[in-house]
Amino acid sequence: MARIAGVNIPTAKRVPIALTYIHGIGDFVAGQICDAVGIDRARRVNELSDAEVLSIREYIDANVTVEGDLRRETSMNIKRLMDLGCYRGLRHRRGLPVRGQRTHTNARTRKGPAKAIAGKKK
């Protein structure tokens, strides 16, 4: 297994698919990386030489925010919104949907499991 950005990527898969195992790299960015480094998208990871893996690793380190740095940046952005006290920050703090979705029904993913209310019947 090749190790890129602290992640063991699968060797049997094609390079763009294997790169998506890294947090912060999706299909589009994986294709961009292959094009920038000059690796054919149809090649598999086990066919790459050490120099090619190194060039992918260097490109990702220089140009893409991934893994821990990306997670830290995202959490700091949410924390900043919460500290500002803006509407989005309040929604994050209360554990409610942030982007205007309805909450009268649904929103169970964000709100958690339904809580029983004593004395309420249908």
From Swiss-Prot:
The record lists its disulfide bonds as none
Task: Write the gene name.
Answer: rpsM
UniProt cross-references to PANTHER family, sorted A to Z: 30S RIBOSOMAL PROTEIN S13/40S RIBOSOMAL PROTEIN S18 (PTHR10871), SMALL RIBOSOMAL SUBUNIT PROTEIN US13M (PTHR10871:SF1)
Which residues are in coiled coils?
A: none
Provide the alphabetized UniProt keywords: Ribonucleoprotein, Ribosomal protein, RNA-binding, rRNA-binding, tRNA-binding
Instruction: Report the GO terms under cellular component.
Output: cytosol; small ribosomal subunit
What terms describe the molecular function in GO for this protein?
A: rRNA binding; structural constituent of ribosome; tRNA binding
Stored Pfam families: Ribosomal_S13 (PF00416)
Q: What is this protein called?
A: Small ribosomal subunit protein uS13
Protein purpose: Located at the top of the head of the 30S subunit, it contacts several helices of the 16S rRNA. In the 70S ribosome it contacts the 23S rRNA (bridge B1a) and protein L5 of the 50S subunit (bridge B1b), connecting the 2 subunits; these bridges are implicated in subunit movement. Contacts the tRNAs in the A and P-sites.
State the family it belongs to.
Answer: Belongs to the universal ribosomal protein uS13 family.
